[in-house]
C-alpha cells in the first residue's frame, strides 16, 4: 500500500516515481550522496524492494550502474545531486547509449527560478547528455496543481520508450526547498486519492503493450544457404543466444569467426586464432573464397577482421543485431535485421546439415603452434594466454591491450561463463566500477583484466572492490603507460612516442591495494601467476573478497612480442 504521509511534495513525487519504477521491474538503484537529491535518496532508502549500491564518486557511480545493468539485463536507476555531479555521468551515459544498456538517470536539480542567476551548485541540466538518452524528460517542481498521475504516466511512457530502444533515459527532477522532513509528516491522502486502486495494488499505472520480437523470414534465405558463407559473431550479451549462432554455423557448414564479446570465443567450433592467422596469406586466401557474410552482433575488436570484411567483395552481407541503430562503419551492409539470434533462427531454418566448404581450421593450425610457442614465458602474452585456460566464472575485459590480447590468444576450452566489455565508446575510464557492478549479478567469481592507465583512471573505484560481497580477481597488466601506441605508426624521433603518447608513470599498485583493503600479489613467473590466480578464487583468501594481481612487464615488450609473432605467422 502506498503511504499517504510524506515530508513534502518533493517527497511525494520522489516516492511516486520510485514506486512506479519498481512496479515496472527496476530492482537496483545506484546512489551518490548529495543534498538536492535528498527526496530521491530518502524514497530509495525507505523502499524495501530495492537493492541499493553506493559510491562517493559520480563518474564511478554511473559506470557501476552500467555494470549492474549489463550483468542483470534489467534497467538500473542512478540518483545524484545537482551540478557537476550530473556531468560526471556523461561517459557512462554515452557508453550505455552506444551499447543499448538500460540506465535510468534521476538527476536532482534546482527549481527554474534558481537557474542562471548565480545560485550555488546550479548548472543548466536540461538536455545535459545531448542526444545520448533515448528519451529525456524535465520534470517540473512538485506542486499540488499537477496531478500525481502525471508522475506515474511519465515514468510509464519513458520506460516504454526505453524498452523499444534500449539505452539510457533521463529524468531531471527540479526540487525547491525544503528538501528534508520537518518536525512531522503531512497527510497527502487527498492529493493521492485520484490514483484509486493503484494505491493498494502492485501494478503499474498505465503499462504499455510491448510487441514480441519477430524476425520475418527473408525470401532469399534458401538461396543464401547454398553459397559459400562465413558467420561472424560480434557482441552478444546472452550466452544462450550465442549458442544459437554457433549451432547455425555448424549446420550451414560455414566457418565461425567469433569475437571475444560473443560468448563463444572459446568454443571449439570457433576459429579461435583467426585474428593472428589473418596475417598469413594461405589462411586469407582460403577465407577469401567466401561469397556471403552473415554477422550476429557488431563492434568487433579485431581490426584485421574488420579490414577483411571492409575490403572483400561480398555478394551479400547481412547483420543481425537487436539494437535498433546503424552498425555499419564501412557502409557494406546489404541487409539489416533488428532481432536476437534466436528470433532469426526460428524463421530461418537450415533444412539439411551442410558439409564445410573450407579448410580454414587446417590453415589455422600452424599459426596456433606459433602462438603457443610465443606464450610460454612470463609476459603480457603469456599471462593472457594462460588466463584463458585457467579462468573460472565471469570475465570483464578492459579496453586497449587487454581486450585485444584476449581476443587474439585465447584457446578453445571451457572459457568464462560470460564475457563483458565496454566497447561502445571503448574508453579506458570507469572500467573498475563497471566490473564491480557486473560482478554483483552472479554468485560466480568475476575476473577483471585491465591495463595500468585504465586502473589509474578509475582508482577511486577500488573502494567499491574493498566492500565487494562477490569474489572478484583483478589482473592488472602494468607496462608503465600506453604501450598500445607502440603498435601504431607514431613517429619515434625526438622522444615523441614516449613523451606524448606512452606517458610512462613509474607507478606500482601495491600501496593502492593496501589502502583499499585488497589482497595483493605480484608474480614474476607463469607458475607463480597460476598459483596466485587459483588461490585468489579459493578460501581463505575469499575472506578478502578481492585480490589484485599486478603483472609488471617492460614497457616495450608486448609490442615487440606481437611484432615478432606476426612476422613468424606471415612466414609460414
UniProtKB/Swiss-Prot annotation:
Protein's UniProt name: 2-succinyl-5-enolpyruvyl-6-hydroxy-3-cyclohexene-1-carboxylate synthase
Keyword GTP-binding: no
Family to which this protein belongs: Belongs to the TPP enzyme family. MenD subfamily.
Gene: menD
Enzyme class: transferase
Region forming the signal peptide: none
Subunit structure: Homodimer.
Any one Gene Ontology BP term: menaquinone biosynthetic process
Coiled coil in keyword set: no
Pathway named in the protein's UniProt entry: Quinol/quinone metabolism; 1,4-dihydroxy-2-naphthoate biosynthesis; 1,4-dihydroxy-2-naphthoate from chorismate: step 2/7; Quinol/quinone metabolism; menaquinone biosynthesis
